[in-house]
């Protein structure tokens, strides 16, 4: 998919758009300069991203890589260091752990991660959390608002990362066509944020998130990314809140997601979730501020 977005009120979007034009560039933000010298962080990225995973991690905002339809601010250096370390611990190494090596990520994960400091707001009241382009590049926004809290990290960064990666996996090896038939004509395309105002409303209709109701591929990856970043209690409570009809639909679709990952990629989503949740509990133990 091209863009993963989160619904916000139109009023909030207008206020933020009107105020951001007055902001001055933070001196800690990084804009690309072709003559810039490699620093300690660049060397660390080479050792921890390029060499083991063949992933280019771009924290200096490159205009050629940025969406010029939005007013964007570069990512701050300190926040870039933090998210780079968190991404390895909470995402890349979790897959390494359950697959037994770095080869899975090296082969299938996008080859470029691009950071943007600010959010990207649309005129219709939605906010872009991340974008993916052809399975080769993921752009993450709101880096300057980074908070070291698991729920916040999942909502604004890692749910998006797993969502976009899941797209690459199903585009590489398709899932069963039976999945799309379950909700069939219930998908609402671009009107999802008008049709489902709350998660609970989407659950009761058989969708794990309002955005998952847009079309089958989004439904598939939303199920996967929500499951592996959520606690078993959340999942159980969600199914209860979904009611008899909604929970049956969600469970039927998730069985296909689970078996697809197990049989096609040899990844048990329960094991992956356990690894991610355990690693989330280790955030306070990480040295995120120094290279």
Residue ranges of each PLM-predicted region?
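Acidic/polar, low-complexity intrinsically disordered N-terminal segments immediately downstream
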Residues: 20-99, 247-291
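Short pre-active-site segment immediately N-terminal to the catalytic Zn-binding motif
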Residues: 142-162
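C-terminal motif of bacterial Sec signal peptides marking the signal peptidase cleavage site
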Residues: 15-19
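Auxiliary, metal-adjacent structural segments of Zn-dependent hydrolase domains
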Residues: 24-25, 81-136
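Metalloprotease/metallohydrolase-associated module, dominated by Zn2+-dependent proteases
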Residues: 187-271, 279-291
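Bacterial N-terminal signal peptides that target proteins for export
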Residues: 1-8
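Surface-exposed patches in mature extracellular/periplasmic domains of secreted proteins
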Residues: 95-113, 172-173, 177, 234-242, ...
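Active-site recognition of the HExxH zinc-binding catalytic motif
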Residues: 155-176, 221
